[in-house]
């Protein structure tokens, strides 16, 4: 275990020596964020590992990253997929023998609680932005609902957490520029927590492989609305699934660089997922679910595929990947370091 950890640490150190913390410093203030190429991480907090009760199953089923948020930041990742839900812990007060419930916005992947919290991520990003004010962060979040958890307080807890960090959060507008976002965070939520967002809401998220830019999702902030073309086709377990995924990735890349699309939607945003899984298992569940090896096998195909298709200066949009910042995970060449480099270089 020590050798693996040391190897990973050396790999990250070598990467950050070339791709320092401040790659956005090279980007002009007036560049629109929607026209950038930004590396991102799918289920970003699984790199922290899982809480003790979820460690065994979580590592088998739900691991999509090797690096934690600080390490992802160090290699150049600037977009983070977060899945908070309410975690309840009951403790007994010794004086009254009464049980008290403590509620935390824990980051989950499915049923499994990672070792990071929603507030914890903001603390990491706040420190990173203070140390590197030329940079910015984008959070894409959703409520990771479960029948096994009481999420009834989720909306209020998310709103409170975002209000506590309101000095960092930028209101969404489709023509948002790098200069307007430097040193701050754009929070885009796929679930609502109040009538108007602190950042932006996304409606119409898609999971198919079609990539139809003429039927875009919508993004809206307090006063302005924009369009989004998203590719998040994630289940490659069927025959032909990998081919369909690769074609969808390439299709969105072409859409993001199409003159026709730019003419009709000059401020369209793009999110392209290389993430997904190829294998399922019933090792810990009654029904087949994704596995960490399935995520690795998919990443070995998709991360390399997209890295090879990024040529010169082009727009990739937000590229949400598994195993960002490392080229090897488990038994697979996941090419997450190579893809992060390619995305950054395309700016």
Question: What positions do the PLM features span?
Answer:
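Aromatic-lined glycan-binding groove of carbohydrate-active enzymes
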Residues: 184-288
């Amino acid at each position: 275990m020590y050798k693996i950890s040391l190897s990973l640490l050396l790999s990250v150190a070598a990467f950050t020596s070339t791709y320092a913390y401040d790659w956005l410093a090279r980007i002009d203030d007036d560049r629109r964020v929607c026209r950038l190429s930004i590396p991102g991480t799918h289920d970003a907090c699984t790199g922290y590992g899982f809480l003790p009760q979820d460690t065994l199953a979580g590592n088998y089923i739900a691991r999509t990253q090797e690096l934690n948020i600080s390490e992802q930041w160090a290699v150049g990742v600037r977009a983070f997929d977060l899945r908070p839900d309410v975690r309840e812990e009951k403790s007994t007060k010794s004086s009254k023998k009464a049980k008290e419930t403590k509620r935390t916005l824990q980051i989950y992947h499915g049923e499994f609680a990672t070792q990071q919290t929603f507030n914890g991520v903001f603390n990491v990003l706040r420190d990173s932005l203070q140390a590197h004010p030329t940079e910015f962060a984008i959070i894409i979040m959703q409520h990771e609902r479960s029948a096994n958890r009481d999420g009834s307080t989720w909306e209020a807890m998310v709103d409170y957490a975002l209000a506590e960090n309101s000095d960092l959060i930028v209101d969404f507008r489709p023509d948002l520029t790098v200069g307007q976002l430097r040193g701050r965070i754009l929070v885009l939520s796929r679930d609502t927590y109040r009538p108007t967002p602190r950042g932006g809401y996304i409606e119409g998220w898609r999971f198919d492989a079609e990539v139809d830019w003429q039927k875009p999702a919508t993004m809206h902030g307090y006063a302005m609305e924009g369009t989004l073309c998203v590719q998040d086709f994630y289940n490659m377990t069927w025959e032909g699934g990998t081919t369909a995924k690769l074609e969808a990735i390439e299709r969105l890349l072409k859409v993001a660089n199409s003159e026709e699309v730019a003419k009709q939607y000059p401020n369209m945003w793009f999110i392209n997922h290389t993430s997904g899984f190829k294998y399922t298992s019933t090792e810990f569940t009654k029904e087949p679910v994704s596995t960490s090896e399935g995520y690795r096998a998919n990443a070995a195909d998709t991360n390399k595929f997209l890295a090879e298709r990024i040529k010169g200066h082009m727009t990739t949009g937000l590229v949400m990947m598994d195993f960002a910042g490392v080229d090897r995970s488990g038994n697979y060449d996941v090419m997450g370091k190579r893809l992060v480099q390619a995305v950054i270089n395309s700016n």
